[in-house]
Amino acid sequence: MTRILVTALVGAVLSGGLGYLLIPMLRALKVGQSIREVGPIWHNYKAGTPMMGGLMFIAASIIVLLCNLPFMADYSVFYVLILSLCFGFVGFLDDYAKLRKKQNEGLTSIQKFLLQLAVSALFLYIMYRSGAMSTEMYIPFFGISIPLHPIVYIFLSMFIMVGCDNAVNITDGVDGLSSSVTLPVMVFFTAAAIKQGKYDLALLPASLVGGLIAYLFYNWHPAKVFMGDTGSLFLGGVVCALAFALDMPLILIFVGFVYICETVSVILQVGYFKLTHGKRLFKMAPIHHHFEKCGWKEEKIVIVFAAVSAVMCILAWLGI
């Protein structure tokens, strides 16, 4: 337990220190965020804010895990890390494309989807072949697991992982939102891994607990840096990979409740717009922008959404 706490503390120190060095470098390289033309007009002042700030907590988590390597008995945490880094690399490609085009549209949706699908398939196959993952679907609150054919499990899981990864990305639309919502999720997975006796696996979410707290000092409104798709897709990868590594993918319904609401709001908005030939269900989607248009300040949105995430994580804990 002491090692877990030290890991979180070191993750915070490293992430904070890296942020202090990284942000001036990003400014010097003019790695600035472009604002979508269809986005909220009151976000225009954020144009030019350095992005790819997710490299802070990504690098911190890598360093922490490598430092713990001599003391590890179970290396499955590196499967989770590698998957997350691959998702983060997809995000990096997207961020890089945005910088080259000097607009807020990077990779096409189909390019991102195919890359994420390939990464998910490889991760699930390796986890299954190594015996680090079961093909039984655990049902929260009922304490039962339903066995599935490996092929069915892997194909179903691929789409869950891609959906989860993109949902975390969609949530990253207000200063401090994605990191604040993900923070209690990382606390949950740290505790869940400890409960299962998977102390080495708990090191990654523990390092991100510290890393995200430090990142929030730079990302709280008004943000000095954005995590970019590099950071948000990395976090999405960690969230879904941990759920599968702990054999509880359906727990994402609870711990990922805010992510799901954000994604569903977009789907409903688009569907309603097409069905009604131009009418909108929300003032703007994702739903955090709807609340902005209702007059909520960014800080209020972050606090409320993070509180909902924390409550749902507590509920998820009661179900395992």
List the predicted regions and their residue ranges.
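Alpha-helical transmembrane segments
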Residues: M1-R27, F57-F89, F123, M127-S130, ...
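Internal, non-catalytic "lid/hinge" segments that mediate substrate recognition, gating
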Residues: L107-T108, A118-A132
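Juxtamembrane helix-capping/reentrant segments at transmembrane boundaries
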Residues: R36-T49, K102-Q116, I287-H289, K293
